């Protein structure tokens, strides 16, 4: 069974309440789709509420575990998209709220961590741009392995050294002081 989330579709908001609402609006349907596509396995399963995406995932995983259903593969595309938008918009306090304590995002990843630990999730594969968000979430989600740091994946995930160097040289020539600061950067 597969549940696929796409955080690139996350609609931004100026406060935590708006972000939570938008996060839940976006992420309730993927788990509901997984249940619908596997209705033969989920039989009489019903969500107790369809308000919180994390609670819905938790309930579906609990049912899967209790009834010996196949393990779930969780795919999250651009897991850091909206948090990166907060950082680039200089909304650091809001970013802090999203990635700390019992925020909607942190709770979501805690549910995934519990699902892996309890055996209802086989694997969670996340794609993203920067490891910043994952670093800030790791105390609650400390079961992640960042594949881009493995040499065998360098050409597959992210930029190669040569690609990054070429782009940096281009930016320095076009917008900076030339190649003088290349080695420093």
Residues covered by each model-derived region:
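Conserved P-loop NTPase "ATPase switch" module shared by AAA+ and STAND
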Residues: 68-98
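Short, glycine/acidic-rich hinge or "gate" loops at secondary-structure transitions
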Residues: 39-51, 73-76, 118-129, 178-185
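Substrate-engagement module of ASCE P-loop NTPases
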Residues: 59-65, 94-122
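P-loop NTPase nucleotide-binding core
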Residues: 1-72
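Switch/connector loops and helix/strand junctions flanking conserved nucleotide-binding motifs
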Residues: 11-17, 82-84, 133-139
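A short beta-strand-to-loop transition that corresponds to the Sensor-1 phosphate-sensing loop
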Residues: 8, 77-78, 107-108, 112, ...
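Short secondary-structure boundary/capping segments
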Residues: 20-22, 88-96, 136-153
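Amphipathic alpha-helical segments of the small helical/lid subdomains adjacent to P-loop NTPase cores
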Residues: 133-140, 147-185
């Amino acid at each position: 069974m597969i549940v696929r989330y796409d955080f690139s579709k996350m609609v931004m908001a100026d406060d935590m309440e708006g972000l939570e609402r938008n996060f839940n609006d976006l992420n309730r349907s993927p788990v509901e789709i997984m249940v619908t596509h596997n209705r033969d396995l989920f039989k009489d399963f019903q969500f107790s509420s369809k308000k919180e995406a994390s609670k819905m995932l938790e309930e579906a995983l609990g049912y899967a575990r209790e009834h010996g259903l196949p393990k779930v593969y969780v795919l999250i595309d651009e897991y850091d998209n909206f948090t990166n938008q907060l950082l680039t918009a200089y909304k650091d306090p809001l970013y802090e709220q999203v990635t700390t304590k019992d925020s909607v995002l942190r709770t979501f990843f805690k549910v995934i961590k519990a699902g892996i630990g309890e055996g209802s999730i086989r694997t969670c594969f996340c794609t993203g741009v920067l490891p910043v968000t994952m670093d800030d979430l790791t105390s609650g989600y400390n079961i992640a392995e960042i594949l881009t740091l493995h040499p065998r994946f360098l050409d597959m995930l992210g930029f190669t050294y040569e690609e990054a160097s070429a782009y940096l040289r281009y930016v320095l020539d076009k917008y900076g002081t030339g190649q003088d600061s290349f080695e420093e950067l």
